[in-house]
Amino acid sequence: MNSVPKPQTKRRTKPPVPPQKSPALTGASLDLLIYLALVLATFAVYAQVGNFEFVNYDDVDCTIGNPHVQQGITAQGLEWALTSRDTGNWIPLTWISHMLDCQFFGQDSGWHHLHNVLLHALAAVMLCIFLERATGTRWRSALVAFLFALHPLHVQSVAWVAERKDVLNACFWFLTLWLYVRYAERPGTGRYLAVALGFCLGAMAKPMMVTLPLVLLLLDYWPLACLGQRGRKAIWEKLPLLGLACAGAAIAYLAQKHAASVNLVPFDARLANATHSYTLYILQTFWPARLAVFYPYPRDFAFALLPLLAEGVLLAVVTTGVIVLRRRAPYLLMGWGWFVITLLPVIGLVQVGDQAHADRYMYIPMVGLLVMLIWGAAEILEKLRAKRLAIPLAAAACLASAVLSWVQVGYWRNSETLFRRALAVTNGNKVANNNLGSYLMDSGRLPEALPYFETAVRIDPESAISRENLGTALGKMGRLPDAIAQLQIAVRLSPDTLKPHSDLGTALAYAGRLPEAAAEFESASRIDPNDAIVQNNLGLALSGIPGRLPEALRHLEEADRLSPDPEREQVIAHLRAKQQ
């Protein structure tokens, strides 16, 4: 029997399953990746500092050479940090951070350097967090933060241990701005007090916080756009912060005067230098070439008139332009205001120190220029319908900055590489000649050191430090008459400074002129009675003068009280026996 075939039914096929896509990164995850990339990029450029030495330009005075800091965290050290005006600044938090380094890392200069790098990376992350919260734009904020982290003009603030105050202050600066954005979103007493606390902590790291209340007003204009809505309240609420800022400025000025850092530069020269420096900082932001640790003032404070007028006109044109465009592009007014205002304390109208300008002064102010650049470039690319160029242009800018910074960081390896570079890219640099000479002298390379000290004296014959260094080098080379002549000039130029008197006393003692040597040590002792070395040398000089042995013993015993020394105790015992 033939089987009847079953009727065929159409097979139902399942619809094709679309390929599974990996879930997109959430906003928070993407932000974390950006922050991680910022930290990694920063350490990629700066990790080399882990093998660097302290440089002989304030590093040792701020760390292992400072008796209050080198002991780490102690009750006496904390009291000193809160009251000290050393280095011409009131910066207790910065001192405490150096104490922590000495507590955990001792004299290992590499770890002191890496602490700076960590704080710089943290500041870049805080900048990114603040800008994204304030503007609502992730990638523009991230690019500003990357350029901040990688820009060569910031190398001085990071690779120089003594500039710990820059990177520490920046962390509190950006934290305070983020806290202020939160306060502006939902005002309240608690949030306002958080802003005030951040401000105070930043001021305890570096006095640059003095301009922050004015920057908050700029943020009210853009990007927060709340200045018109809140009216006078936006101004009144800044007054307590302005009061704190004025108090901080007064403390900083008095500290600088106490440290004799406020120099008498003619006002017309200061005004000319301020105009030139504003223009130069803009140029160095976009073309960071020939950077140095120290830039001297022009000889006799002479500025060329026509270039100076051109720079003044340029600044006036930019200022006018950002005001005219304030409604169409409000970020320009905010960025320019940020740049101009935050530079005011260090632009040189009140001259502090010998420098004409400094890379480190752009650490915070550069953010204003970067905001103008990034937001402006983004708008231009949108109008040109060329947004696809944004990523390659941003990558090129970051890569170029990273490469240039890597090279610039290398100059900070030690004092010799740092100051040889400064001499290569500047003229008439007394500081670079003195510091390079000092490094060579301390390394036992006296014949190499001498020409640098002689050059420093030629640049500024009225510099007590240059005369003192030259005299010390000549003395170590056995040229005592020449050494004494230079040190006598140093004493005349700086009669209230301890070291010239002490060095002259040492040279006179080696020359056998003990009464004159004792007189110089006595002058040094009057300046600082608690200097053990001066007391020791005064005692030794007096011990060689007939009839003055009791005085000699008194000073040697005082030296031993200040700094106990077994060898000195043997000398004291010998002199006591001789006295009997």
Q: What are the residue ranges of the model-derived segments?
A:
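Boundary/linker segments of alpha-helical solenoid repeat arrays
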Residues: 431, 464-465, 498-499, 532-533, ...
